[in-house]
From Swiss-Prot:
It holds the Pfam family dUTPase. Substrate binds at residues 67-69, 80, 84-86, 94. This is Deoxyuridine 5'-triphosphate nucleotidohydrolase. Coiled coil: none annotated. The lineage of its organism: Bacteria, Pseudomonadati, Pseudomonadota, Alphaproteobacteria, Rickettsiales. Its cofactor is Mg(2+). Its EC number is 3.6.1.23. NCBIfam families: dut, PRK00601.1. Belongs to the dUTPase family. This enzyme is involved in nucleotide metabolism: it produces dUMP, the immediate precursor of thymidine nucleotides and it decreases the intracellular concentration of dUTP so that uracil cannot be incorporated into DNA. Pathway: Pyrimidine metabolism; dUMP biosynthesis; dUMP from dCTP (dUTP route): step 2/2. It comes from Orientia tsutsugamushi (strain Ikeda). GO terms for molecular function: dUTP diphosphatase activity; magnesium ion binding. GO terms for biological process: dUMP biosynthetic process; dUTP catabolic process.
Length: 148
């Protein structure tokens, strides 16, 4: 599937287009479209531009997710992961990041900061009923299936 993309920010010496790291990658890396380094202090958030805008077909969304390396090594994640980019949004993609670590985290220009997964979704309509179909689980929730 071809998707239209607008480059809002041009990186010097490298591409700003989202890219798959390997042939088996589900997510494409997104890059920090910043001109100079920026610090995210512990327990603070930052809105980081990705330097692109996209035009997804109806019935598709882009999910913005954390990169596992940033999360495991530094405690830096996408705050609302997965963030949803709707098919009718045409503005620049911006990533809400939070530093859950204990030290300042420095973002550098063109750093890989998040990943984007394109997913198909269904548009539904509601059918109001008095009762739902029975299941073995029923209304049990919040730990009812145990830990092991």
């Amino acid at each position: 599937m071809k998707v239209k993309i607008k480059q809002i920010y041009q990186f010097e010496g490298t591409s700003s287009l989202p890219a798959y790291s390997t042939n088996g990658s589900a997510g494409m890396d997104l890059y920090a479209a910043i001109a100079s380094p920026m610090i995210i202090k512990p327990h603070e958030t930052a809105l980081v531009p990705a330097g692109i805008a996209i035009s997804l077909p109806y019935g598709y969304e882009a999910q913005i997710r954390s990169r596992s390396g940033l999360a495991s090594k530094f405690g830096v994640i996408v705050l609302n992961s997965p963030g949803t980019i709707d098919s009718d949004y045409r503005g620049e993609l911006k990533i809400i990041m939070i530093n859950l670590g204990q030290k300042d985290f420095q973002l550098t220009p063109a750093m890989r900061i998040a990943q984007m997964v394109i997913a198909k979704y269904e548009v539904i309509s509601w059918e109001i009923v008095d009762d739902l179909d029975e299941t073995e689980r029923g209304e049990k929730g919040f730990g009812s299936s145990g830990l092991k």
